[in-house]
């Protein structure tokens, strides 16, 4: 894993240009700006935080959506 170093703006500098690692909690408005300006957003859906596997939940939701559309 690549290491990050501190930059003058307070954010950590990432080895990848244009990518920031935030060292603190950000406000709701800052988070909205970050999401709207992002090219992509990825979520970790394993069971580190919750007891269910997130990918299993997605599969269940997609299966239910497929059943609803096929019944028409």
Swiss-Prot record:
Q: In which tissues is it expressed?
A: Highly expressed in FA (Fanconi's anemia) B-cells of complementation group A and Raji cells. Not expressed in B-cells of other FA complementation groups.
Lineage: superkingdom = Eukaryota
Q: Which family does it belong to?
A: Belongs to the HAD-like hydrolase superfamily. SerB family.
**What's the name of the protein?**
Putative phosphoserine phosphatase-like protein
